[in-house]
Amino acid sequence: MATEFSWDEIKKENVDLERIPVEEVFEQLKCSKEGLSSDEGAKRLEIFGANKLEEKSENKFLKFLGFMWNPLSWVMESAAIMAIVLANGGGKAPDWQDFIGIMVLLIINSTISFIEENNAGNAAAALMANLAPKTKVLRDGKWGEQEASILVPGDLISIKLGDIVPADARLLEGDPLKIDQSALTGESLPTTKHPGDEVFSGSTCKQGEIEAVVIATGVHTFFGKAAHLVDSTNNVGHFQKVLTSIGNFCICSIGLGMLIEILIMYPIQHRTYRDGIDNLLVLLIGGIPIAMPTVLSVTMAIGSHRLSQQGAITKRMTAIEEMAGMDVLCSDKTGTLTLNKLSVDKSLIEVFPKNMDSDSVVLMAARASRIENQDAIDASIVGMLGDPKEARAGITEVHFLPFNPVDKRTAITYIDESGDWHRSSKGAPEQIIELCNLQGETKRKAHEVIDGFAERGLRSLGVAQQTVPEKTKESDGSPWEFVGLLPLFDPPRHDSAETIRRALELGVNVKMITGDQLAIGIETGRRLGMGTNMYPSTSLLGNSKDESLVGIPIDELIEKADGFAGVFPEHKYEIVKKLQERKHICGMTGDGVNDAPALKKADIGIAVADATDAARSASDIVLTEPGLSVIISAVLTSRAIFQRMKNYTIYAVSITIRIVLGFMLVALIWRFDFAPFMVLIIAILNDGTIMTISKDRVKPSPVPDSWKLNEIFATGVVLGTYMALTTVLFFWLAHDTDFFSKTFGVRSIQGNEEELMAALYLQVSIISQALIFVTRSRSWSFVERPGFLLLIAFVIAQLVATLIAVYANWGFARIVGCGWGWAGGIWVYSIITYIPLDILKFIIRYALTGKAWDNMINQKTAFTTKKDYGKGEREAQWALAQRTLHGLPPPEAMFNDNKNELSEIAEQAKRRAEVARLRELHTLKGHVESVVKLKGLDIDTIQQHYTV
């Protein structure tokens, strides 16, 4: 008998559980093949810890300080140092007010960043908990699905195709597994693991199904030890590069402005040292978009949370910007475009042996199905029995071969009541035909039936049986007998056709990727209105038998196709690769372990609901709800998130140019020294307002969108220059003319620098903050309603700014209130000079894309006279097209706009009802055609009584 070791020795790995016989493993871990009890599992969890890697604890204070450590903050910190070190000259004391103000601005910004990121981090942690790996574990004598984190040494687990091995374990009795250890060892090919072998946490099961006993968890696993030696890295992606580019542009603009001021103020104008420093501080403080990293990060975090509420959990934050730019979506058919709720019409089952009927074929198929942990096919087959227990009634299961992508079938070896051994198998018809070695007329008949099913959009399932005279599970048995073919109907989702239409309107081309036959793909594409321009997977390799495809380059074929049939996972990778070579932003859905390479290769890998652990691990976005509509909703939400970020970056660049150019010209032309403290007030109020943009109401782009730095910089420079010139014009009117006195009847403030300071402060504050309403809108800013928070923040900030301009009397900032009369005049001037900003925006967009004027009149923007943005008109056109497709006469008065006959509400109700009926008819007719043609009838000879 083996020496027993204590838990402490096992924890310290003094016991070689990897090499000792499996029987000794059970002895050392004090467990059995009945599994652990829940109480014992809880005790061991306290000893060995949770089955997850150690998370480094964060120092909250250092994290807070970290928000002050970036290039933009460095510029502000340099300004703070200037205020107390370089400003200490010219017979004046250090500028403590500006120093304190800058530090307050930095602390406010860091505090908001810290709080928002902490909240976002907590929300993300809660979301990622939903993606925590699950495993099938034997506890209290029952198999159940539990979170992998509760596993302890001694637990019995089940590993099947697509699972990521949750802990280091030793395999028990069963068939060998194919294990992909590339994530751990770098081996590109799967390795075969036999009973008794060790499998490592983090590896992926590529084939087979077996039970195993856990020997190590968490940091004690092979993967845990390796991960402990290296620090994780975060891929900053394109977002960080864009952020850096914009930050560098702003810093360079400020540097250029400061250089010009230094070269003119000191050698030419002979300004005093302190006045020059104050003017340089104005450019430094006012020009830096200090809130930019915070605003953009918070916007993405909040957007990610919103996506999760819609059923799309983002594992990689920057996937949001890629989703916004996606223009091609390669979608699985089964479960995404269809319901994956299979049904079998027993009357259409094709039985081949003369001594069997359809019930016998169903029973054979049910025996080759799982009773528990079923997939959609198993559930539909077993569900046809009166009682699911009939599938195992009167037989003893010896061995079950689970489905795998290579064999594409399942099989059971069993003993009947008389003691004879048998096997039954079900699977892809071609595999079953090959298994049975069908020849001649029987093979031709099988293919005719399969093709007949496929033409009507029905999948085929082959069923076979054999006897096993040798009575061993390893023996080949007698020749297989082809039993029959079952038609599987997987109805399209009720919203798939409408969702595909929406996707096309949004500029996203949906391509169907299916492993089914070409005829099934074409029929499904016809029903969903996504086109029938589909090709077999052989065309991807240039082996198509269709002569019309021979001369077409493969990448062009992939780009123009509506979908591909007979696709294997490796084909998906090739499709993504070719689309990316054609400069498309490509999304790919997947659910199986073999989809992982394509999901990783795609710009946006999307693991559908109920995907395997391997597919989830490789994806960027994990869906928690089935269907295509979740993806399209996520596209819209991503575009809205991206629009908010782009709006802010244009705003930030504009403000930098506006502050640098405006104050530089005022300082150099009139030698007017604007107080740095007043720029700080503008910056603080601006930051407070701009933080709300992360929750702003925006209209997503109607086409795929992406970062276009030339658009951001061009728009920012033009708008910023215009605003700077309006400030220069305002100062000239107030400083050198009596324009405001004559126009608004206010007293002149010429020569009164303190009141000029107040007036200039208010003008800069108003137009700077109002700019956000221009950059946030695609159309006219006054017709696209902003979010409530943004509007309230703007009103409060400008109320504070106006009160400061009217009443302030701060000697250290050289400001005295200019009164309500001047404040009113400044507001009128600001409103008048605000109006051309929209026109400038359109001109810039037109110059860059040639499409800007559409934003003034297009139905996709808010500025339109069409009700619901033309939705009713589009629905009417769709309904009319469907009536024509079904041979129905056009309605005479269905869409009559005569308001004397029908009220507008009744008209809309009729239109909705018409559209709903036609959609139902569209689906019903397809089903009727399927059944009628399978019965060998001519549908044209049958009287039609379609009524609407």
From Swiss-Prot:
It is a multi-pass membrane protein. SMART domains: Cation_ATPase_N. The active site is at D332 (4-aspartylphosphate intermediate). It is an enzyme of class 7 (translocase). One of its GO terms (biological process) is proton export across plasma membrane. GO terms for cellular component: plasma membrane. Its EC number is 7.1.2.1. Binds to 14-3-3 proteins. The binding is induced by phosphorylation of Thr-947. Binding to 14-3-3 proteins activates the H(+)-ATPase. This is ATPase 8, plasma membrane-type. The gene is AHA8.
